[in-house]
Amino acid sequence: MKNRELTNKEVIEIQLNYPHGTRIVLNHMEDKWAVPPGTRGTVEHVDDAGQIHPKWDNGRTLAIVPQVDSFRELTEQEL
């Protein structure tokens, strides 16, 4: 998927859907130094561009670009 600038409405929606403390798991990341698929993390914040900044369980801090990368929130059973 092509990276495009998000609207303010889209950024606010991401911020509301992924507040600080949300647990996520990465499916795929489009980056030369990508975090490995299956890595879990905790959302620290969503920036003004709509990028999600998790603290990955493996110690990495690379941001997710929602319109390019694939991830999901962990279910209650997975926590």
Residue ranges and their predicted role:
Residues 2-79:
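Basic/aromatic-rich interaction segments and small domains that mediate binding to polyanionic partners
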